């Protein structure tokens, strides 16, 4: 009950993943990120063990193609799994087991993978791929989120009888480039919500503002005001912080 995009940005060198599902707390279940900034997802009948197997293999220096084969050797239920591996260098790879619930499948582009299971149809991942390809001028986080939104608007999750399922959790992670390829520029999670993709959009817009402040605390602590002062000024200006939760009770 999941749709996912893992992608690299050729313009910035960043990489990341966005995922949404009817299950809860997907950000702690499916995605993995190596110290080299490689992106992994283990989903469908999700196995943390398979995700960890791929992660460990890549940390040990195996190629993405070698790493994605490790669960297929050790997991007797591999046909229930869907696996995505997006290395920083090299071809993206994916596997969709024969026993994943329909509609299930994946599409691989030069710098991305879109995949899902228990979907309204192949049109869901096709729309995600089109949204990603058509947004090259935007930052990677925006492109990933647009792809997720396109998947939802194209039917999202649905049972075989056509019953639609809502997305109750979502996750968005963007990793840096170069020497900071393992640094998480965005690491956002919606663990339980009646409309997780919409909530992720709200959270993303707020984090774009708050993230600038967080970067200032990291890089220029001697020039950065306290959070209380920052949020008071942000609330005064309005914008995305208007009517949002703040550190004030």
Residue ranges and their predicted role:
Residues 1-249:
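N-terminal nucleophile
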């Amino acid at each position: 009950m999941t749709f996912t995009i893992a992608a690299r940005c050729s313009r910035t060198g960043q990489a990341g993943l966005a995922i949404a599902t009817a299950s809860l707390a997907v950000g702690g279940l499916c995605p993995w990120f190596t110290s080299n900034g490689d992106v992994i997802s283990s989903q469908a009948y999700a196995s943390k063990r398979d995700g960890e197997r791929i992660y460990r293999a890549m940390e040990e220096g195996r190629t993405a193609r070698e790493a994605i084969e490790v669960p297929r050797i050790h997991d007797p239920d591999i046909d229930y799994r869907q696996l995505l591996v997006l290395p920083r260098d090299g071809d993206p790879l994916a596997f969709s087991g024969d026993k994943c619930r329909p509609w299930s499948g994946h599409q691989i582009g030069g710098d991305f993978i879109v995949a899902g299971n228990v979907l309204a149809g192949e049109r869901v991942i096709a729309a995600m791929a089109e949204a990603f390809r058509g947004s090259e001028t935007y930052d990677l986080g925006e492109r990933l989120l647009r792809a997720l939104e396109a998947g939802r608007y194209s039917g999202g999750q649905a049972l075989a009888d056509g019953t639609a399922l809502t997305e109750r959790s979502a996750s968005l992670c963007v990793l840096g480039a170069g020497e900071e390829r393992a640094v998480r520029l965005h690491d956002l999670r919606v663990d339980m919500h009646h409309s997780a993709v919409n909530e992720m959009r709200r959270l993303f817009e707020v984090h774009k503002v708050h993230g600038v402040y967080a970067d200032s605390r990291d890089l220029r602590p001697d020039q950065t005001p306290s959070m209380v002062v920052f949020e008071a000024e942000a609330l005064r200006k309005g914008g995305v912080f208007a009517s949002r939760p703040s550190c004030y009770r």
